[in-house]
């Protein structure tokens, strides 16, 4: 199972994200990454399941507006990908992560109601400076949030 971590509302701190990622090393041996943008930082440890070679995270949309750190599996991602391609969305990977990200870019938070699967995620909108956190409706993939002074 992958691991995601991050912060919002702090000064940019890549070293903090690297330490967070080090603490969740057991969550994924297949890669790690961080994204720092203003008051938001996302970290990801990867356990490759789908598109082993190209699903590195955090992942950005092609226009750079959104970044995602995601853990889970959306079982209907191929159907969603087809819908999104019909709407003009293009893809550079075969990963469900990119489908989830493109779905959010297309439909906003309404995208989550279209997902059949288990997931926890953080999506940073660079234009709106807004962090969206979401998890599957049953909480199969937990998502913990802490508010600290």
For each of these PLM feature ranges, what is it?
Residues 1-149:
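N-terminus-centric sequence/structural signature that marks the extreme N-terminus
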